[in-house]
Amino acid sequence: NGFFISKNNKWKKTIVDEKYKGVKINKILKDCKKITYLKYKSKTPQSFNEIFENNYKSKDVVLTGQLYLPKKKGIYPVVYIQHGTGHPKGFVNAYHKIIEEMHKENIAVFIGDSYSGRKMKKSYWKLGLAARVYDGLSVLNTLSEHKNIDKNKIGITGYSYGGMVAFFTAYPKLLDLVSKDKQFAAYMPVYPGCDVVFKEPKIINKPMLMLHAEFDDYAPTIDCINYVKK
């Protein structure tokens, strides 16, 4: 039902996967109480042309992400985390640490999931960039309407392929077509690939921090440096 165990009456027989090492079970249970499962409707365009031409070849899909609020009441800014090629359930430990730190600052966290709603269980790389970006803009639409979220303080971050989502959702034309008058308040792409860009390099005038590793040879830094120079 999600990334965490929701019900298990045989705790003594439970074997915790190595990737969850360091996450204490009482903290997991505490976080489970804070989860709001949030549905958002998206599409699966095979290319950006489908978005630009408003001509989609696939049916709508309903995805479900996890919203972690610091408290059940109140209105909060939110950081939306978009996963990369790997399934988000594989990053529970890292997400838990981020959630914990964000909640100290009274900031909510939303974790997107582009795979489960599409019934994808392997070969995640087959989901293209256009579909992932559409998912990101759909999350923006949904979070903007949530009663506990400050619609003017929705930030986005992502890693690798998710970093490209955090980058491409800053393009004005895509925002206009999918999210109308809504925008993210801040962007933090982490080692995105900048080798795929639009001819018009202009992005919206919002803060963006792009993080890279100097010797990364998978998502080369130089591509993003050259893009910024444009």
How does the language model describe each region?
Residues 16-73:
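N-terminal cap/lid segment of alpha/beta-hydrolase-fold proteins
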Residues 56, 61-63, 78-143:
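Serine-hydrolase catalytic machinery in alpha/beta-hydrolase-like enzymes
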Residues 111-112, 158, 212:
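Hydrophobic residues in well-ordered beta-strands that form the structural core
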Residues 130-204, 217:
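Primarily recognizes the serine-hydrolase "nucleophile elbow" in alpha/beta-hydrolase
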Residues 220-229:
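Short alpha-helix in the alpha/beta-hydrolase fold that links the catalytic acid
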